[in-house]
Amino acid sequence: MRLDDFHYDLPKRLIAQRPSEPRDSSRMLLLERSSGEWQDSTFSALPDLLRGDELLVVNNTRVIPARLFGHRVGVRAQNPGKSPKTRREHLSSPIEVMLTRRLSENEWEALVRPGRKLPTGERIVFGEGELEAEVLDRAEFGVRRLRFHGAAPLEQSLERLGHIPLPPYIAREDDPADHERYQTIFAHEPGAVAAPTAGLHFTPEIVARLRARGVEIVEITLAVGLGTFQPIHSEEIEGHVMHAESYEISEVTARAVEKAKRERRPILAAGTTVVRALEDAARKSAAHAGPQVAVSATRGASAQLSARIEPGRAEANLFLYPGQPFLIVDQLLTNFHLPSSTLLILVSAFAGRENLLRAYAHAVEANYRFYSYGDCMLIR
């Protein structure tokens, strides 16, 4: 399929620059996969729109202050006798670093700008010299591998020096409010460089109402990284290669998913990150088990390749596009995504491309708010 098949026009005025207040006041577009019909609603109505026996899977990753501003270290700046203030005067050109994936305690993959002339061995200083990064090598997709050095643990330095990595279509700098609002209420596992935005609409009150209705809620962890916002450069989408993202599925969650599948209870994924983790784990489990069983890929029901989910840590570079089966997920809660993006293509694979683009056209006409801080869809 061609990338142009997933384009739509969006007025800039509909790109949300701030979140809705309160969280659950966001609008929600309900889309039925089987018929393509839609209905306008609000997120606060979610508990009333569900059957009550769903398994809701959420992403508990926490966004870190992954955006850093520093300077390249000049030759004169390498004199260890210089004070931080004097040393700052000898730093050369400014550098912006966007962390994308943690490799170890002090090593990260990162996007660096400008990075074209940043060779291996180059050093970058942040703040008054309390944090440094050394360029180890180039990784895939044009990112650099960095090793950080500092007197304090890296997490503490990031909290002090880093900025919340708001997406580029939010045309402002981050502020103190974003440190709370660009996190979901489920967030407790640090490591993401973007929020799992479908989770931003939940409140403790909504969670309590869902549980009172009989909805079971479990968690996965997927540290959102470069794979989420990496653009597609090939005209044919099948040629795109996703950047790997780490995820973890607990024993409790794996068994809950398997039990729900056996009992034919709907599995509702809160966001595309949950979809990628569950669907990748199902494929890995099926491959480990041997020959695949027959796949039923009827529209409106999940394909039953494998109801087995292996718990543990893994990496996913799964790219879901139309024609591929969904093995686990039955329903999807998701925000509105950028044109021609991997996320829009994933949702098109789940909902049907024509269904989704018609629903998006309605959302534009009805002035829904788009992207990370915008409104959402419930697709079932």
Regions found by a protein language model. Name each.
Residues M1-H288, V293-R380:
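Surface-exposed, charge/polar-rich loops and edge strands
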